[in-house]
Curated annotation (Swiss-Prot):
Similarity annotation: Belongs to the P-Pant transferase superfamily. AcpS family.
HAMAP family listed in its UniProt record: AcpS (MF_00101)
Gene name of the record: acpS
Role description: Transfers the 4'-phosphopantetheine moiety from coenzyme A to a Ser of acyl-carrier-protein.
Highest taxon listed in the record's lineage: Bacteria
Protein name: Holo-[acyl-carrier-protein] synthase
Intrachain S-S bonds: none
Length: 117
């Protein structure tokens, strides 16, 4: 049974302007996600990855119905890729369906949550 659907869109330029602010990356990305980010050497690909992770966490919190804040933080949401490259989020009590896309200027994510009964 579908519990919630969330979607988020961001201009990559906004992430470009934020990425150098003190602790922005540490606040947004988990340790595993930072390790993945550091594997990318091309600046545009790094920005796409960071923007994608930002939007997927926003979309997840919207699907959960809480938004980011007291109930769930950026650090509570770890997005990783499975063996086939599909983005995944593990969260107790839910099955998640994740989609991340980007163009040169925008990143967008959609998350569908199903209650794990």
């Amino acid at each position: 049974m579908i519990y919630g659907i969330g979607i988020d869109l961001i201009e990559i330029e906004r992430i470009k302007n934020l990425q150098n602010q003190t602790k922005f990356i540490e606040r947004i990305l988990t340790i595993e996600e930072r390790d993945k980010l550091n594997q990318y050497t091309h600046e545009q690909r790094r920005l796409e990855f960071l923007a994608g992770r930002f939007t997927v966490k926003e979309a997840f919190s919207k699907a959960l119905g809480t938004g980011l804040g007291k109930s769930v933080s950026f650090q509570d949401i770890n997005c990783y890729n499975d063996a086939l490259g599909k983005p995944c989020i593990d969260y107790p009590g839910f099955y998640t369906h994740v989609s991340i896309t980007h163009t040169e200027n925008y990143a967008m994510s959609q998350v569908i949550l199903e209650k794990n009964e």
